[in-house]
């Protein structure tokens, strides 16, 4: 089952193997746990880790647990290993009291090195080293192809929030875009973050003409300030503009960008990034390959 179909909430995956059990020590960063070798039951609450497991061919029977990590449910039928990451990492103390728990939160500051390390860790647990090496080699080959296309070129990454666009530098949350793509931010690009206020709430039905005028002027000012910042940013003349909208599908976002007074003029060089891959799953194994394929197509 593809990982992207399982992401309406946190996920639990039950993994089955028929290999004999034996104790195995696992060391990961500052964590050391002892698990059953080739565990037959594992609870996964991290989309990137689930993607890696499925990439390696570890058979999973997965279900959505309603978006909540429920320690009581886990304690009722304890797994042999629990994997957390990202939003669920803060529950480590809760789950460690139930079963051995690993926090596999991706380190996107060292994206490719960390991806390889997490992949090989899981491959070692489940005896999938050969598959892991082949998959990692494929990722490396795709990145080499992409870097040939992007050599010497620049981009800005825009995250859509509250009706505005927040630029992302190499040091921001989505800075791994630059690592994967080989693109750089233009030297003179103003990547300063500005708080993007949400659009104002609808006026009451019986709003006065003065209230309506004030609301209209406030909205016009808000949009004008956003557009002025975009104009200043794009004056750096990036080769590409990557846009990620966490809250809408590609068709809706494309329509919004086409009618935008600033970005509408740059449609030929805009890369519209897949929300599931870039925002929901992130640093998985097959998912990284998908992200690279997306960028290869966009820079062709």
Predicted features, each with a name:
Residues 41-77, 81-87:
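A short, structured surface patch at a secondary-structure boundary
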Residues 113-117, 236, 240-300:
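Structured C-terminal subdomain patch of bacterial secreted/periplasmic proteins
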Residues 8-18:
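Bacterial N-terminal signal peptides
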Residues 71-87, 100, 230-233, 237-242:
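Proline-aspartate-enriched helix->loop->beta-strand connector
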Residues 41-45, 49-53, 132-215:
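Basic- and aromatic-lined ligand-binding clefts that recognize polyanionic substrates
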Residues 2, 18-48, 130-160, 245-253, ...:
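Bacterial Sec-exported substrate-binding components of ABC uptake systems
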Residues 92-121, 272:
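Flexible loop/hinge segments that line or gate small-molecule binding clefts
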Residues 28, 65-72, 192-196, 210-230:
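Short helix-initiation/N-cap motifs at beta->coil->alpha
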């Amino acid at each position: 089952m593809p990982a992207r179909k399982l992401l309406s909430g946190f996920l639990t995956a039950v993994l089955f193997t028929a290999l004999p059990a034996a104790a195995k020590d696992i060391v990961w960063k500052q964590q050391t746990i002892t698990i059953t070798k080739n565990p037959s039951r594992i609870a996964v609450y991290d989309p990137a880790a689930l993607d890696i497991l499925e990439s390696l061919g570890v058979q999973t029977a997965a279900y959505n647990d309603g978006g909540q990590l429920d320690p009581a449910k886990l304690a009722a039928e304890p797994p042999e290993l629990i994997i957390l990451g990202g939003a669920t990492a803060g529950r480590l103390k809760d789950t460690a009291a139930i079963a051995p728990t690993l926090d596999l939160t991706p380190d996107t500051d060292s994206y490719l090195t960390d991806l390889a390390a997490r992949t090989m860790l899981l491959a070692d647990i489940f005896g999938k080293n050969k598959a892991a090496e082949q998959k990692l080699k494929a990722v490396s080959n795709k990145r080499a192809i992409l870097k040939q296309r992007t050599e010497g070129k620049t981009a800005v990454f825009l995250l859509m929030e509250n009706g505005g666009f927040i630029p992302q530098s190499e040091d921001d949350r989505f800075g791994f875009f630059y690592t994967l793509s080989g693109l750089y931010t233009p030297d003179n690009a103003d990547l300063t973050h500005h708080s993007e206020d949400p659009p104002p709430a609808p006026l009451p039905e019986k709003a006065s003409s003065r209230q309506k005028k004030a609301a209209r002027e406030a909205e016009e000012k808000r949009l004008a300030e956003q557009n002025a910042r975009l104009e200043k940013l794009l004056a750096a003349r990036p080769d590409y503009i990557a846009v990620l909208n966490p809250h809408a599908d590609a068709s809706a976002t494309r329509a919004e960008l086409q009618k935008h007074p600033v970005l509408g003029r740059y449609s030929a060089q805009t890369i519209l990034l897949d929300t599931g891959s870039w925002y929901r799953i992130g640093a998985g194994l097959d998912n990284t390959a998908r992200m690279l394929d997306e960028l290869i197509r966009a820079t062709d």
